[in-house]
Amino acid sequence: MSHRLATALLFTLTNLVITMPLQATPLKDHLWKNRVIITFSASVKEPERLALQKQMEEKACAFTDRNLVHIDLLQGSEDFDEMSQQFAVSSSGFQLLLLGKDGGVKLRSSTASLEDIFSLIDTMPMRRSEMRGDQC
């Protein structure tokens, strides 16, 4: 198996683990285990959504190392409506929320920059203690 094919397969498997539908992963299941990125998109072709997916592919190890999971919600779905009400998110355009391991909203953004998210996470006390055993 070529290195390129193995890398693509690894990312695909990793992405299946980190991008999950809400029904399969209630938020309470992530408390104290994971940080959660929730994205709200009007379309599958939303530029910010596509940019985030590319960044997650390129930075899969750093994403996983920070105990991140991604919940991708599309406008019109029941989960989108429920979560946008719960978190007071507009139903137009792209919105990103970062939830800490404590379940609190740490970031609201209309842009998708994993570097900014990683920088914010790396300032959190819980993350600082985790960084002692980094895998990347």
Predicted features and spans:
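Non-catalytic interaction/Regulatory regions outside core domains
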Residues: 2-136
